[in-house]
Regions:
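Phosphate-interacting basic helix/loop segments used at nucleotide- and nucleic-acid interfaces
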Residues: 116-119
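Major-groove recognition helix of helix-turn-helix-like DNA-binding domains
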Residues: 75-94
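Extended, highly charged
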Residues: 96, 121
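Single, function-defining residue in the core of a domain
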Residues: 1-61, 65-66, 92-94, 101-105, ...
Length: 409
């Protein structure tokens, strides 16, 4: 079966998911419209989205290709191809807050037209089925930059990097909060910002890098449940056994912190669980802590195991979108590229959800990238891809999440 033809190019069909008046509206809000002359804000966003879809390696790559398809561009909301200098200047000087605002506005729009997209966007394979609450997975990822970014993103002695702190909704496998900063921002310091929008009754799961007992106590007061790993130097006193050891659960106890400062920061009791967990094919003892005193110890272990979903999320972005070669060196240009990468991701995820795509995200990306300028119905293209035989690979596994130049934690 061949894909059916369409009067629009695949690129136009993807870009059409962004509301027509949204980009001009945000350009006025952030003052970008005053900076635009021949290269409109819409043309700027389209060029960056195309750079993500084509996995472009640089400014010339994007500019040359867009000039070669100038006729098709004019049909996409009268956008125009940029000059190299004009594109570079726009990335460097136009307020990147517009790109961030655009991402959240488009995500909100997609949620409004299809509410089930956000609540059931994609069921992660390791999602603990016994939990009906919202599960928020929190982590950060370091994005390596070139040495030219040292003036604003110095990371260690001779390296530059940005860091993306992200809160992932495990029901939909979509981000619910993102903050992009230089890599010297410590995870624990960003924890309050990342968790600010979490509601009472929801669950937060994060690595021990985010452990700040002042913040953990604030979450307890707010009615938020949390699960994390215990640091090796945590001082505590066992108050009693919570439940008997069973299977991979070595110890389940109720404790009270005894550190000079931590006992003041977190005056209530909490749960400490020692368990054997499989890591990279080997059994390893891990220690978890939580403020929930009712769940089974195995459920708390399952919740932390679900945290590895965020590594799969970072892997999907790294393997498909362009977060290795950047189109500019200053902070503004880097932020434009990161936010348009996330924008492209949610557009493709929405297409995957609408088409009931059952293969990997990477295959969806490559299927559409190959016909980006063709006048084919993109859903028909994906339907044809789905006719191939063989075992369907649903999505990446956490143990495969090795990201060159994109370190998690």
């Amino acid at each position: 079966m061949n894909p059916s033809k369409h009067k629009m190019s695949v690129l136009k069909q993807i870009f059409k998911l962004i509301p027509r008046n949204l980009i001009p509206k945000l350009a006025r809000k952030h003052g970008v419209d005053k900076q635009a002359r021949s290269f409109s804000p819409g043309s700027h966003v389209l060029a960056l989205v195309f750079g993500q879809l084509s996995h472009a390696l640089g400014l010339n790559d994007i500019c040359d290709t867009l000039w070669n398809h100038k006729g098709v561009l004019t049909t996409i909301r009268e956008t125009t191809p940029p000059s190299r200098n004009g594109f570079s200047h726009a990335n460097r000087t136009r307020n990147a807050d517009m790109a961030e605002d655009l991402f959240w506005s488009v995500l909100g729009h997609l949620k409004s037209i299809s509410p089930r997209f956000y609540s059931q966007g994609r069921n992660y394979c390791a999602m603990p089925r016994k939990f009906k609450r919202v599960i928020n997975v929190i982590d950060s990822s370091t994005i390596q930059l070139v040495a030219n970014c040292m003036d604003w993103a110095k990371h260690r002695r001779r390296k530059a990097a940005a860091k993306m702190h992200l809160r992932l909704d495990l029901r939909s496998f979509l981000p619910s909060f993102v903050v992009v900063k230089s890599a010297d921002s410590h995870d624990a310091k960003e924890a309050r910002t990342v968790c600010a929008g979490v509601n009472s009754g929801e669950i937060c799961v994060f690595d021990k890098a985010y452990v700040d007992f002042k913040h953990l106590y604030e979450l307890l007061v707010r009615g938020v449940f949390w699960v994390t790993r215990a640091k090796t130097n945590m001082k505590y006193e066992a108050m009693g056994q919570h439940s008997a050891a069973k299977g991979n659960i070595l110890r389940d106890e109720v404790i009270k912190l005894t550190g000079v400062r931590t006992s003041k920061w977190y005056p209530k009791i909490l749960r400490r669980i020692e368990a054997m967990a499989e890591v990279d094919g080997k059994m390893k003892k891990m220690v978890f802590i939580s403020n929930n005193l009712d769940w089974a110890a195995s459920s708390i272990c399952d919740l932390y195991k679900a945290r590895w979903a965020i590594e799969v999320f970072f892997k999907e972005i790294k393997q498909t979108l362009q977060l290795a070669d950047f189109m500019g060196y200053n902070e503004n240009a880097v932020r434009w590229q990161i936010w348009t990468a996330l924008l492209t991701y949610i557009l493709l995820r929405f297409i995957a959800w609408q088409s009931k795509w059952k293969h990997s995200f990477n295959r969806l990306f490559t299927a559409l990238r190959g016909v980006i300028w063709n006048g084919l119905d993109m859903y028909s293209v994906l339907e044809c891809c789905g006719t191939a035989g063989g075992k369907v690979r649903m999505r990446a596994a956490p143990e495969q999440a090795y990201l060159p130049g994109f370190n998690t934690g």
